[in-house]
Amino acid sequence: MTLSPETPAPLGTDTGPDLRETPRIYVACLAAYNNGRLHGAWIDATEPSEVMDKVRAMLAASPEPDTEEWAIHDYEGFEGARLSEYASFETVCALAAFIGEHGSLGAKLYREFCDDLEQARAAFEEYAGEYRSAADFAEELTRDSGTEIPASLDYYIDWTALARDMALNGDIMVFQTGFDEVHIFWSR
């Protein structure tokens, strides 16, 4: 079956573009900006050398002469992670790759560790798993440890409170990434 541009694809078929957003940055020419002109380019955060080449091309096309200074004025696709306007392209591309691999969970970890990418990466060594809730994690951990809970007491255990106490005591970190979707990390 050949689809013409006017014929919509049947439901359930994958014929459209990948809707996953590639992290990108808007790099502005500071000489133009300081003279009241907006001149810049949206650049995919892929490889630092490619980003720098595109920045050089953008600066060469600037309406101001002899431009060499730039700044990151906007960004998208970083799932809420923050970028400095003078972040190195190595940092930008490394963060983009990390978020590409881990999605919003990666961005949440990056923010949790004060924008330290190495600490966010290291946190995955202490990943305990994905659960419907932190209470489910606390219950599974308790039951898997061999603790016998009599059936008559089972309904009296507040798994939510236990999970909250584990988080407040610094034993675990809990990140919610969706409805009934939490990720637990040990805080060792």
Could you say what each language-model-derived stretch is?
Residues 109-110, 117-145:
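Phosphate/anion-contacting hairpin/loop surfaces
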Residues 2-61:
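N-terminal ordered "arm"
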Residues 6, 19, 135-188:
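Acidic, proline/glycine-rich low-complexity IDRs
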Residues 3, 8, 76-79, 83-87, ...:
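Non-transmembrane, interaction-prone alpha-helical and coil segments associated with secretion
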